[in-house]
Amino acid sequence: MAFDPIQEDCHRLVLEALRRDNIPLTDGPSVERLMEQFTRNPAPLIVHDRDRAGHLIAKVVEAVDYRIPFIPDDTQAEQEEAAAENMLREAAALDPANWDAQRMLTALTAESNEEYVQYLVSKCDEVEHDLALKIASAQDPYEREAAGDLIRRPYLRWLAALASRALISGRYRMSLEAANRSLDFAPNDPAGVRHTAMLAMAKLEYPAEELRRFRSAHSVPYLANTPLRRRPKDAERDLDPWTLIALMSAAWRELDYEGAEHYLRILVRSCPHAAEALYFQTEFPDGVYARVNVGVGSTDELVLALSEAAPVLSLI
């Protein structure tokens, strides 16, 4: 459901090393050796400025998305955030075409969410055009391998950030349009924008039937995380929390209080400590790189969904 910056850094550096030494992509032992090198010490794999820029981003993500939000000491957190910002500035200078670096730096330095949204909107077509050029210009097997997945991800993260931040700013139609744009480009939805789309549709007061049609139209990523079930009622238990919240909101608006209570009961039973999470609705830190990694069906996933769904829940 989310992107792994360390895994991407490893993939990128290993692919570049194979290319430099003209090692076939099918050479399993060499790939394994390079991956072990990355785990031990990635420094020998970092040759070009773009390599270092990508590696810096992975380090920044570890800090700003997974460590700093949970540091209790404000002074230490501010120091680490300043260090992360400096690393992003270095990454952006080393590789001006690295859209992750540009976007994350703006996310950290923008004066407001609205300013960040405007930046994302203003550059979105440029990011898409740059990606199209990279895909079209891929010549060797290594470039084509990257073009099939790796170099597409910054664009998907861009659209996911736009969808998420537009939702926060109350621009629900813009949020839904960005999510649909991402789903059209990548139907497997590695960015998880379908969840943001569900919340935007709830705020736009789509009826419950429209929400179900949306899930059906984008069934591939939903099925990837859903166990096979024989009975429809059993399948309801596997609905993700974003869908359950959106359906609960739709039922409430339609004065279907029994239906709203039904989805609430499923939420309460969805994971350990669900009732506590629903009661406190703790704010979950918004990922700067992308939606943070949480386990499917976990309490953390529910807390994350509740945090993102704050605009929806405020009206229930």
For each feature predicted by the language model, list its residue ranges:
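Glycine- and acidic-residue-rich phosphate-binding/metal-coordinating active-site segment common to enzymes
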Residues: R181-D240, A246
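Alpha-helical repeat scaffolds
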Residues: E80-R89, Y116-L131, Y172-R181, Y206-A224, ...
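Amphipathic alpha-helical repeat scaffolds of TPR domains
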Residues: R12-R19, H48-I71, D95-S112, D149-R165, ...
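Long, ordered, amphipathic alpha-helical scaffolds
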Residues: L45-I46, V60, T226-I316
